[in-house]
Amino acid sequence: MAYNSYATPQQKPSDEVERLPTEAVNIWSHQRAERIGAFLRIALACVLVATFGGMPVHARVKKIQISVKESPTFGGYSWPGVGQYEKIVGRAFGELDPKDPKNAVIVDLQLAPKNANGKVEYSFDFYLLKPIDLSKGNHKMVYEPPNRGRKTIAALNRGVGAKDPGSVQDEALLANSFLMPQGYSISFSGWDASAGISSADFNMTIALPIARNADGSPITGPAYEYIVNPGASYVLAYPAATLDQSKATLTHRVHLNDIPETVPASGWQYNADGTSIGLLPAGTAFVKNDIYEFSYVAKNPTVNGIGFAAVRDWNAWLRYETKDDSGTPNPLAGDITKIYTEVSSQPGRLLNDFRYLGFNQAENGKQVFDGMMQWIAAGDGISMNYRWSEPGRTERNRQDHLYVEGRFPFANVMSRDPITGKTDSRYAKCELTHTCPYAMEIFTANEYWVKAASLMTTDPTGTKDLPDSPFTRIYFMSSMQHGTGRDTIRGVCQQFQNPLDSQAVQRALFTAMDKWATAGTQPPPSQYPKLADGTLVKPEQNSTGFPQIPGVSYTGFKTTRYLLNYGPNFYKTGIPTVNPPVFTAPYQDNPANGPIYPSFVPKTDKDGNDVAGIRLPEVQVPLATYTGWAVRADPQSPDGCEGSGQYIPFARTKAERIASGDPRLSVEERYGNMETYSSMLRDAINNLVKAGFLLPFDAERALHKNVKNVTSQNLLTQK
């Protein structure tokens, strides 16, 4: 039988920053699309009635194709009590019933091509690591939905996890890893169409269908692109429905609050098939770091919401089924008792919407995930389950404001939206089906400034704090940027990047989550700024208390959450009729852009370090000011520097401080000598261990790292 076109975008670099905890370099924030038409034929087997515990097959992973099986992997390394691991890599093929109420929430699923059984088909890459002898494992699995196709688990796993984790053969690194010594199985799978079509370097991809009108004709509609740093051409997420330039508008500006200038039709062109645009004369590059916006009529929308079901059904299949429809055995059949997710940023936003939309209930009615480590995802959703969506996009205080990301409900507990009158929470659906996962919501100061994270802990009117959900804890990593930067690199920012690293805290909280899900042991109390105690404040400098530091710009600019107008029925149908919505300068708290959800930022101490939250040893016993926000250097100054924070060192001596006019005490004035500094540092680390925010192994490393940092710079005398 014939199938309609399937599509997967082609990777393409962008300057939009999404920093990973183990990387100081940028990863692509969104990869663009080159639609490919293909007849994707998936071998259909007769429907087998496989059973697991008396349950019929529900998780519609129909077939897996294994391309790599390496046993043992990790160079044959064997962990005491667990033994050796094996690696299994391949492609999984799934199908969805559009009539199943659990799938009905997926926008445009009814308009996707269907097979002879009336099902919608898709496929994705998977990568699995497991003990060869499952009886020696702990019968639990960690699942990571990759960040734009890329694995980020190395942060949690003490350095083992990038690209092809099984290729690591460094015995010292493997011995000190976090997950394998405990016997965890680890899985990754494709879900995000913006990850491209190439599986090179074990990039995790997904092939999704293109929606069409009921009569088979192409769907067209208004689409929008935010463009920064594309070079001489820009590949559109969706091809243009017409090459008529009068149906499109390209604008350009240098600063966020500048008035956009329209580029005349004589200044740009489509390529021959309408899949990209470029400036004229041909070969002219877009100005680096300037803002271009393109609105046009697009065609062939991908059904991106299938990515939610792909995550659900892959994990449900591994957990509850014994084999695929062709009889290929499930490598983890009968072994899994718990599944925990681990994410970094973008896929955490995926799982925010995953929970909200009810996807933690499998098609067989059972729970999929038991616990979620939600690292730097805050209360945002993802640009995925609507027509013309782009999952690779991420809104910050300069970029991507007009992609649907920050929508009510923001919190895990019930609150009332004063704009629409709706009462809802991210956990409302799973509470009804008794399938709610425990979750550790861990985010940084950057998420308050560029992601409006305070909406996760306040009501939408911004007048009161919300209580914890019984299923979640919220942990604010004080003074951190979005991930970990390098304190020797400025990039496009005015100051050096913020080097604070939360990997050790994540391991402690993962351990606490496991105990919570397994034994009911309560994790450490939530730690975050609050309105009630004055640690959550307005962004103006006289409210935050941030000091006047010579050479440091303070703008107080934060991202504002609006209820944007995409057309009268958008929030019911997921289909925009107005795109882009009206959005004009100034962009912060401007009622002209729509009703506002008030948001706030953390208060700082006299050094400029955040007061509330989990304060790392470097923040409790500081040698610098660390911020979660940053300002761009010229020519884009004073725009925000997106995911970056700042590292602003203290003067070494009192004389240096006075000479520069710095109000912050010098290192010498604070500590006097190395002995005092080391003692204070040790106390701070021990207190974090007692509070459950550091494991003993990581505590020793933290002490050694910070002492070495001071001695290598000769900041203090010994006594």
Locate the predicted segments by residue.
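Structural signature of transmembrane alpha-helix termini at the membrane-water interface
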Residues: A50-G53, L156
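Bacterial N-terminal signal peptides
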Residues: R41-T51
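Sec/Tat signal peptide C-region and signal peptidase I cleavage site
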Residues: G54-A59
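N-terminal secretory signal peptides that target proteins for export/translocation
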Residues: M1-G37
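C-terminal His-loop and adjacent cap/lid subdomain of alpha/beta-hydrolase
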Residues: R60-K719
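Long, compositionally biased, charged low-complexity segments
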Residues: G37-A38, R657
